[in-house]
Amino acid sequence: MEYLKDISSSLSGWEFNFAPGWQSVTASVLLVAGGWFVVSRVWTFLRVLTSLFVLPGKSLRSFGPKGSWAIVTGASDGLGKEFALQIARAGYNIVLVSRTASKLTALTDEITSKYPSVQTKMLAMDFARNLDEDYEKLKALIQDLDVAILINNVGKSHSIPVPFALTPEDELADIITINCMGTLRVTQLVVPGMTQRKRGLILTMGSFGGLVPSPLLATYSGSKAFLQQWSTALGSELQPYGITVELVQAYLITSAMSKIRKTSALIPNPRAFVKATLSKIGNNGGSPGYAYSSSPYWSHGLVAYLATCVINPMSKWLANQNKAMHESIRKRALRKAERENAKKSS
């Protein structure tokens, strides 16, 4: 018994003697970890600011010489039209692809009048139909061209925020077919030539809806999340061939799709957004944690940083905030539709 008492006394002594040391080590580890966390967050934020406001992007000339070709899908309106105009101004010939032939003709005339040395080709095709013959026509149109740039801009969203269970089947099909299949099939036509030439730019329009789950825009959000993953994987595949792949993470822009007409600090017009995008190619902007991706417009970049680096973009809280916002938008849209219907019937 005395032997056990001696052991107990010894153990008690060890606990008494070593506990303060362990507390000191624990405190030091926590201090170092906390300091590292703060420093890394500050460093990341400084990288974001530098990328958004200081560092220039890659020159378009690095993807192909003046006189080579750029393909712009969804080219007849909004961002697509602005991409076509600004790339034409840089001296690239343009292939315009969109649904409405009359709008493509008007844009062709505008480009020709502003930039007489720039050649244009156009193809009217409805991406929602996903016809093999349309893609064969596009393949034939570009097969002998030095395509240096592809702007995957074609896209479709919901007409108004809508619960998934109430989404019309044709709207579901159109969103997936246009946003996903259309982008993939056009890109697949362009990649072999770029790989052979060992240069090129594939720029795909993404959305914050692909970063943050967007209730009442579930199908659109899912399609953009798909493009986010696909583009990142493609970027890794094509980097060894000298091809730059970039997905542009965009918030709201004044356009027919967003149905927003008034600009603000958070909502630029297409001209300002495209200018920022083309001047920041290769920079992550506000998306430092996303490879082969960028949020180049300054205010969008800051919001993207908050959503992805400060807040968990997949959190239930953020999804619920989006849900509340879209429910409010839906209510206003339905009330507006009711008023318009009442006017028509009166």
From Swiss-Prot:
This is Very-long-chain 3-oxoacyl-CoA reductase. It is a single-pass membrane protein. It comes from Emericella nidulans (strain FGSC A4 / ATCC 38163 / CBS 112.46 / NRRL 194 / M139). It comes from the Eukaryota. Its main location: endoplasmic reticulum. It catalyses: a very-long-chain (3R)-3-hydroxyacyl-CoA + NADP(+) = a very-long-chain 3-oxoacyl-CoA + NADPH + H(+). The keyword Oxidoreductase applies. It holds the Pfam family adh_short. Keywords: Endoplasmic reticulum, Fatty acid biosynthesis, Fatty acid metabolism, Lipid biosynthesis, Lipid metabolism, Membrane, NADP, Oxidoreductase, Transmembrane, Transmembrane helix. Belongs to the short-chain dehydrogenases/reductases (SDR) family. Component of the microsomal membrane bound fatty acid elongation system, which produces the 26-carbon very long-chain fatty acids (VLCFA) from palmitate. Catalyzes the reduction of the 3-ketoacyl-CoA intermediate that is formed in each cycle of fatty acid elongation. VLCFAs serve as precursors for ceramide and sphingolipids. PROSITE patterns: ADH_SHORT (PS00061). It is found in: Endoplasmic reticulum membrane. The lineage of its organism: Eukaryota, Fungi, Dikarya, Ascomycota, Pezizomycotina. Coiled coil: none annotated. The chain crosses the membrane at residues 26-46. The active site is at Y220, K224. NADP(+) binds at I71, D126, D134, N153, Y220, K224, I253, S255. Its EC number is 1.1.1.330. One of its GO terms (biological process) is sphingolipid biosynthetic process.
